C-alpha cells in the first residue's frame, strides 16, 4: 500500500491544534533526535501513540482530538491500525465525515487508485457504511513535478471526482484541498507556494461553503441530525456490579433517549426492569441522547443475567428483539478463497461478537446499484457483494440498516 501520508497529515493536525501536551511533545522530540530521526516529523507523533496503544497502555484519548474554530474533532482511524475496518463497521466509531488522503507524487496517486489500491476500497467502504460527507486532501504537493503543480492537482481532482461519483458521492459537495502534511501547506493556513489555488468550494442543499485550507474544510462539515426521535437502542459494552448501587450496564445511546424511570427491556434475553438513574462522566443525567456513553443503574437484575452485546430499548416503544436468522447485504473485502453456503465465521455487530452461519447465499448484486446480477450463486469471493441469509449460533439483536444504522452494520472475521 502506497503511503499517502495519512499519519503525517493527522499527526500535524493533532500536533498543531490538539490534545498533545508540551511535555509529551518534548519527550517525543528528544527521542526522535536520539534515534537519529533528525528533524522531528508529525507521523512520529502518531507512531508513538499507536505503539503505546498497541502495548495496551490506554492513552489519554484527548490525544486523538483536536479543535477547530467550530468543532472538537475526534480522529477515529489512527491510519493503518489493523482494526480500523472492523471498528468502522461495528460502529465503535461512527464517523460524521471521511477525509480521503491521496498522494500527488508521480506514480503514487496511480498506485493508490489502481484497481486494487486502498484509496478506492476506503472510499467505497466509507460510503457503504453511511459516511456521506467527504473531504479530499491531495497530499505531498511538495513532491509533484514540478513541485506544487497546478496541473497535477487538477488531474487528480478530475480522476478522484469521477470515481467517487461512481461510488455515490456528489463531487460538487466535496472539498478538494491541495496540501503538504509534511510542510504544512494549506493545513491550517493558506500556502504561499500555490498562488494558483483560489480555494475550495462546495455546494449542497444546506448551503455553500468555501475556504483555502484543510482545517476550514473540516469546519464546513454539517453536523449530523442525532436520531433522538427514534426508538431507544443502547448496545451494552459492559455490565458492572457496583457496591451499594447494584447492577450498572454501560454503553452508548445509538438512537432515542434514555432517562430515569424508563422501563427498559434487554434483547435478546427479554429481561425487563426499571432504570433508577443514568450517569455520564460521574454526573447524574436527566436524559441521555445519541452519542452519550453512559452507565445506568437497573433494579432487580443481576450482573450474571446481562452481557456485552445485549441491547437495551424502551419496553413500551418499538422494543428490540433477538433474531433467529436475518437477511443482509454482505460485501467480501479481503477473504482468501471462495465462500459458500455453510460458511460460519464470527460476526461483530455493534458490541456483539457471535458465530453466524451463511445459511443461504441468495443472490450476487452490483456493489454500487444493489441490482441483482446472479441468483443462488454457488459461492462468492473477494470484491463480491451478495444478499445472504445468516443464522446466528444464538439469538442476536440486529436491526434494519434503514431504521437503526448502528445495529444494521456488521463485520465478519
Swiss-Prot record:
Q: Which Gene3D superfamilies match?
A: P-loop containing nucleotide triphosphate hydrolases (3.40.50.300), Translation factors (2.40.30.10)
Its biological purpose: This protein promotes the GTP-dependent binding of aminoacyl-tRNA to the A-site of ribosomes during protein biosynthesis.
The similarity comment for this entry is:
Belongs to the TRAFAC class translation factor GTPase superfamily. Classic translation factor GTPase family. EF-Tu/EF-1A subfamily.
Q: Where does GTP bind?
A: 1-7, 77-81, 139-142
Quote the protein name from its UniProt record.
Elongation factor 1-alpha
Q: Which UniProt keywords apply?
A: Cytoplasm, Elongation factor, GTP-binding, Nucleotide-binding, Phosphoprotein, Protein biosynthesis
Cellular localisation: Cytoplasm
The record's CDD domains line, in alphabetical order, gives: EF1_alpha, EF1_alpha_II, EF1_alpha_III
Its main localization is cytoplasm
Q: Name one Pfam family in it.
A: GTP-eEF1A_C
Protein source organism: Heliothis virescens (Tobacco budworm moth)
Return the PANTHER family for the record: TRANSLATION FACTOR (PTHR23115)
This protein's superkingdom? Answer: Eukaryota
Which parts of the sequence belong to the tr-type G domain?
1-228
The protein's matches in InterPro entries, at most eight in alphabetical order, are given as:
EFTu-like_2 (IPR004161), G_TR_CS (IPR031157), GTP-eEF1A_C (IPR054696), P-loop_NTPase (IPR027417), T_Tr_GTP-bd_dom (IPR000795), TRAFAC_GTPase_members (IPR050100), Transl_B-barrel_sf (IPR009000), Transl_elong_EF1A/Init_IF2_C (IPR009001)
Q: Which GO terms describe its cellular component?
A: cytoplasm
